[in-house]
Design a protein with these regions (language model features):
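A composition/biophysics-driven feature that prefers long, compositionally simple stretches
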Residues: 21-206
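A residue-level detector for conformationally permissive "hinge/kink" positions
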Residues: 5-6, 167
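Bacterial N-terminal signal peptides
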Residues: 6-16
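N-terminal secretory signal peptides that target proteins for export/translocation
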Residues: 1-3
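Short, intrinsically disordered, charge-balanced linker/junction segments flanking boundaries
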Residues: 212-218
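Charged- and aromatic-enriched interaction segments used to assemble
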Residues: 166, 211-212
């Protein structure tokens, strides 16, 4: 009985340690992604918005249908509609707003200046009066084509005809934003490459493969 209890205790301890390690790794990945996002918002976003002559960039999410750029912007739950809005107000940095996106993840990532409701969008845009509003529709790049027709209609109803005339494609803007790397992003790629190398080395080692016995089915 004592041996059985000891064995159970060891199993539980190993399970808890494994869970703690997994949680620790998840936390590290979250912090790494937050750092990358912050650096890209600080360093890349002002550059690419100004190069593409864009005053405001709006990304629309709706429940069950996330834009491909959502991961880049920080995720967060959307109940009906939600908007990530980036505005060039003529200062060094770009103003970042999250409207209608569940605040938990957005607040935790620390990248946004304004967190509000989706119903605030019209007043928010009116106050800033942008001349060029980039939206995620594109002919060639799928990752920049996340705005569905229904969301486009919803946005146009919210903003009215005045601003509908100022829409431009965010295709090149989104491509530029994603393709320009920051230091923390390069470091993350290096870390991922090293992890892949370690996995491949073990997968093809004698620790896993027994010559003459191991098959593809194994």
């Amino acid at each position: 009985m004592a041996f059985r209890f000891a064995g159970l205790l060891v199993s539980i301890t190993c399970l808890l340690m494994s869970h703690a390690n997994a949680s620790g790794e998840a936390q590290k990945r979250w912090e790494r992604m937050n750092q990358i996002r912050q650096e890209k918002f600080d360093l890349v976003l002002p550059e690419v918005m100004r190069e593409n002559d864009v005053d405001m960039w709006i990304t629309v999410n709706r429940e069950g249908f996330d834009d491909p750029l959502t991961e880049d912007f920080g995720k967060g739950y959307v109940g009906s509609y939600g908007y990530y809005v980036f505005t060039d107000r003529g200062e060094g940095r770009i103003e970042r707003a999250s409207l209608g996106v569940g605040p938990a993840l957005v607040e935790d990532n620390g990248a946004y200046d304004i967190i509000g409701n989706a119903d605030d969008l019209n007043a928010f845009v009116e106050e800033r009066d942008p001349q060029a509003i980039a939206l995620n529709y594109a002919r060639n790049i799928g990752a920049a084509d996340g705005l569905c027709y229904t969301s486009f209609q919803k946005l146009s109803e919210e903003l009215g005809a005045k601003y509908a005339e100022r829409y431009v494609s965010a295709e090149k803007l989104a491509s530029d934003f994603r393709s320009r790397r920051v230091a923390s992003e390069i470091a993350a790629f290096a870390w991922a490459g090293e992890m892949s190398r370690n996995i491949a080395e073990r997968a093809f080692s004698n620790e896993v493969i027994t010559p003459g016995r191991t098959t593809l089915a194994d």
